[in-house]
Curated annotation (Swiss-Prot):
Molecular chaperone; assists the folding of proteins upon ATP hydrolysis. Known to play a role, in vitro, in the folding of actin and tubulin. In yeast may play a role in mitotic spindle formation. This is T-complex protein 1 subunit theta. Coiled coil: none annotated. Heterooligomeric complex of about 850 to 900 kDa that forms two stacked rings, 12 to 16 nm in diameter. The keyword Chaperone applies. InterPro entries: Chap_CCT_theta, Chaperone_TCP-1, Chaperonin_TCP-1_CS, Cpn60/GroEL/TCP-1, GroEL-like_apical_dom_sf, GROEL-like_equatorial_sf, TCP-1-like_intermed_sf. One of its GO terms (biological process) is chaperone mediated protein folding independent of cofactor. It comes from Candida albicans. GO terms for molecular function: ATP binding; ATP hydrolysis activity; ATP-dependent protein folding chaperone; unfolded protein binding. GO terms for cellular component: chaperonin-containing T-complex.
């Protein structure tokens, strides 16, 4: 009798190198464990007192941040189920710009309670059905928990932006929120604006209190060439091509039998630059913004005719400056027409903190671009402030869609937990899934209490007692004193709805996966970064 060795599942079906994990092998439990791992990484980074993480990417660049979106972008995650959750958080970042951490944490907690229900014997379809019913009830309940509205964007916008920024930069949220609101007020037109019209320029030195908002654009570089006197040029015309006056240094050679022909090429080239610069000056050109480097010969004639050159390598910045001054980007070589040139009110070159910056200031109402000049002591601090500003600007985009506000600081989660638990309209085993769904919301106030250094069990008991009363809707966690009171912290309804909905969708998608089939990774073997010990080619 011959001996038969056991083969891998589906070994005769797929090509060599495939791996398969089915539900019989515990695929769902493994998926939950993978999601729990990524959720535990981001869990302690939530809230105003959230901890920072040090992440070193594959290029060796270090990130010190508590921003979930930044961490997920820099982490190289290969697990296919966790990637589903990351896609949901990126969708939240794209649509609302905030609460990306909430999507991961809620989905991880939903899967934790679902794992317990699976061990009790509930079917996956029953858990998904119960979660969907509870999610529909939550969407209706959130509309009933609205406490305030942003009626006027000039006066009420600050109270909605402060909590968003405080989650990233606690203690300086007043200063940053004022910068964000001022910048949005400059670019908003008829109740709407484009988030790309608000730029952030980081300048090392000084403190955050010296940051300012400029109507127009600020470039962290000084002009090229010798023409640098750019202080307050009124009503100047700006010509903005992508490539203009760019000429590589070329070497010319000739034999002794052709001396006259040898002089034609450089002389013709000089005449071309002279003609272009002279005609541009006649048309009124005072400023030139090329999208690439400028050759030495072209820069010589531009300096000769008093044309100031500022190189803008970013094509996105070129498009924005076109919107500010009304210029047309041109790829051709030659003098621009009056219709192709733009106008600007004030152009000035200033020194901020030892760095030379060029400011395009447009005081007219037609300009829809604003720049926040951020000051700080370290580069890491400036990066964190920039992320907080981005979250604040994107949160205003969510307020434009829906101006209703919810109580924050863990108040709305405890209230949802109370109302979902009292939801008794569904009989049978689905009631277990609905109550477990409600229990998952308790993770938010627990994390807020733990990261702020307080006893989470004591605070949770006080929260439940406060929300048991009819007047306790706005009772939240005061992270400074550790008490439960009306903290005046507000959350945006549209952002909260989107985060919960995406977390539930991602949870149901992960629970419905009963098998994972993975192909062999393409490419050859990865070469070692360092020589192995004992290698004959290694220097002793």
């Amino acid at each position: 009798m011959s001996l038969k060795l056991p083969q891998a599942p589906n070994s005769g079906l797929f090509k060599q190198g495939y791996s398969s994990f089915s539900n019989a092998d515990g695929a769902i439990i493994r998926n939950v464990e993978a999601v729990r791992e990524i959720a535990s990484i981001l869990l302690t980074s939530m809230g105003p007192s959230g901890r920072n993480k040090i992440i070193v990417n594959k290029l060796g660049k270090k990130f010190i941040t508590n921003d979930a979106a930044t961490m997920l972008n820099e982490l190289e995650i290969v697990h296919p189920v966790v990637k589903i959750l990351i896609q949901a958080s990126k969708q939240q970042e794209f649509e609302m710009g905030d609460n990306t951490n909430l999507v991961i944490i809620l989905a991880g907690e939903f899967l934790n309670v679902a794992e317990k229900l699976l061990t009790l014997g509930l079917n996956v379809s029953e858990i998904i059905q119960g979660f969907n019913l509870a999610n529909k009830f939550v969407m209706k309940t959130l509309d009933e928990l609205v406490v305030e509205k942003v009626e006027s964007f000039e006066t009420d916008l600050l109270k909605a932006v402060k909590p968003v920024i405080a989650a990233k930069q606690y203690g300086v949220e007043d200063t940053i929120a004022k910068l964000v609101v001022d910048a949005v007020a400059l670019v908003m037109k008829n109740g709407s604006f484009n988030v790309d019209n608000i730029r952030v320029v980081k300048v090392m030195g000084a403190s955050l209190s010296q940051s300012q908002v400029v109507k127009g654009m600020v470039f962290p570089r000084e002009p090229e060439g010798t023409v640098k006197n750019a202080d307050q040029i009124q009503s100047c015309r700006v010509y903005q091509p992508h490539r203009y006056f760019h000429h590589r240094n070329q070497r010319y050679s000739c034999s002794s039998t052709m001396p006259r022909k040898c002089l034609i090429s450089p002389r013709a080239k000089n005449n071309s630059w002279t003609s272009c610069a002279r005609k541009s000056t006649i048309q009124g050109l005072r400023w030139l913004l090329p999208g690439s480097s400028v050759g030495e010969l072209a820069l010589h004639y531009l300096n000769k005719y008093g044309i100031l050159v500022l190189r803008v390598p970013s094509k996105f910045d070129l498009r924005r400056i076109c919107q500010v001054c009304g210029a047309t980007p041109l790829p051709r070589l030659g003098a621009p027409t009056p219709d192709e040139m733009g106008e600007i009110d004030i152009i000035e070159t200033k020194e901020i903190g030892g760095d030379r910056v060029t400011i395009f200031r447009q005081d007219e109402s037609s300009s829809r671009t604003a720049t926040i000049v951020v000051r700080g002591a370290t580069q890491n601090n400036l990066d964190d402030i920039e992320r907080a500003i981005d979250d604040g600007v994107n949160s205003i985009k969510g307020l434009i869609k829906d101006n209703r506000l919810l109580p924050g600081a863990g108040a709305v989660e405890i209230e949802l937990m109370k109302r979902i638990t009292a939801y008794q309209s569904t009989p049978g085993l689905l009631q277990l899934a609905i109550k477990s769904f409600a229990k998952a919301f308790e993770v938010i106030p627990r994390v807020l209490a733990e990261t702020s250094g307080h006893d989470s069990s004591e605070i949770l008991s006080k929260l439940h007692a406060a929300h048991a009363e009819d007047t306790g809707l706005r009772a939240g966690i005061d992270i400074d004193s550790g008490e439960v009171a009306d903290t005046a912290v507000l959350d945006i309804l549209a952002t909260k709805k989107s985060a919960i909905d995406l977390a539930v969708d991602a949870t149901n998608t992960i629970l419905s996966i009963d098998q994972i089939i993975m192909a062999k990774r393409a490419g050859g073997p990865v070469m070692p970064q360092q020589p192995r010990p004992g290698n004959w080619d290694q220097d002793d």
